Amino acid sequence: MSKEEKLAIAAATDGACSGNPGPGGWGALIRFQDGSEIEFGGNSPETTNNRMELQAALFILEKLKNIEFAPSLTIKTDSKYLIDGMEKWMPNWKKKGWKTASGKPVLNQDLWKALDHPELPKIKLQYVKGHSGEKDNDRVDAIAVAFSKGRKIQLKDFANN
């Protein structure tokens, strides 16, 4: 798929963990102007819900590097940890050598640093309440939970839209 083929207009991410730590999964989707969607998911055998939230966001940003997207595109997430980390905490962590206000090393530093990579697109995050009936959030949650539990789930791609 080239940048010229489709215009991305919406995105959503979620992470889930069975036990915390425990087996985890993440889900993500991108919706295009023509109504088509692509969905993604992944898992980790031993992780936390926060790591899965960050992994989902990192994956979708990596995908959006190579896709044309509308300037109004936001990434919907139910993770205040992700939003606060990206929008409030990260500048101070960087100033303090990736330490928290209390001087402790930032948790999940590898993923935060990857999310801060200058080649990733800067896209606004939009908070949505989890399990509230918001269609995209419910879908990426279902993907994340399925991957965390090792269940099969049909993901949409351009062939089955």
UniProtKB/Swiss-Prot annotation:
Cofactor: Mg(2+)
Annotated RNase H type-1 domain residues: 5-149
GO MF term list: magnesium ion binding; nucleic acid binding; RNA-DNA hybrid ribonuclease activity
Keyword field contains Isomerase: no
Catalytic activity from the UniProt record: Endonucleolytic cleavage to 5'-phosphomonoester
Binding-site residues for Mg(2+) 1, renumbered to this chain: 14, 53, 78
Pfam families, A to Z: RNase_H
Record note on cofactor: Binds 1 Mg(2+) ion per subunit. May bind a second metal ion at a regulatory site, or after substrate binding.
Compartment annotation: Cytoplasm
Binding site for Mg(2+) 2: 14, 141
Keywords for the protein's UniProt record, in alphabetical order: Cytoplasm, Endonuclease, Hydrolase, Magnesium, Metal-binding, Nuclease
GO biological process: DNA replication, removal of RNA primer
EC number: 3.1.26.4
One GO cellular component, as annotated: cytoplasm
Family note: Belongs to the RNase H family.
Function: Endonuclease that specifically degrades the RNA of RNA-DNA hybrids.
Quaternary structure note: Monomer.
Protein name per Swiss-Prot or TrEMBL: Ribonuclease H
